[in-house]
Amino acid sequence: CVWDIGPPFGRFEGHPGIHEAIYDVLWPAWQESHHLTTNLVIRFSDPDNASSICDVDCTGTLTSAEDCHIVGATYSDVLQRRAGQWKIHQRNVQIHYFNPVAGTRLAAPA
């Protein structure tokens, strides 16, 4: 499996690489993040292989910042069915913007 998050995070391969991405790169970078996907299109090349593309909006707070950030990206995935279960074999992420929202903090309603 491959997870190519792109700059500023990098490319990660295999289960050890995905583990590194989560535990050593993403979780230390983000206090909190929420990912919303939309406009999903799936194309099947045969009964066990497909590709998909979708838009993603992420709102979160970096560990190094107080203000929240917004990220707009596209996920392009290679999907495979193995032993009857669909899995993401490869995810390529194209980040379109990664911006702070000055003066905005993520907080529960008062």
What does each model-found stretch correspond to?
Residues 35-38, 95, 110:
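C-terminal-biased regions
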Residues 58-60, 94-95:
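Short, surface-exposed beta-strand-loop junctions and turns on beta-sheet-rich folds
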Residues 51, 72-102:
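Short beta-strand edge/turn micro-motifs at domain boundaries
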Residues 59-68:
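Short, cysteine-centered beta-strand-loop-beta hairpins and adjacent loop/turn segments enriched
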Residues 11, 68-70:
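Short, mixed charged/polar active-site loops
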Residues 101-110:
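Extended, polar beta-sheet/loop recognition surfaces of beta-rich domains
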Residues 35-37, 70-75:
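Short, surface-exposed coil-to-beta transition loops
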Residues 1-56:
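A solvent-exposed, acidic/Ser-Thr-rich amphipathic alpha-helical stretch
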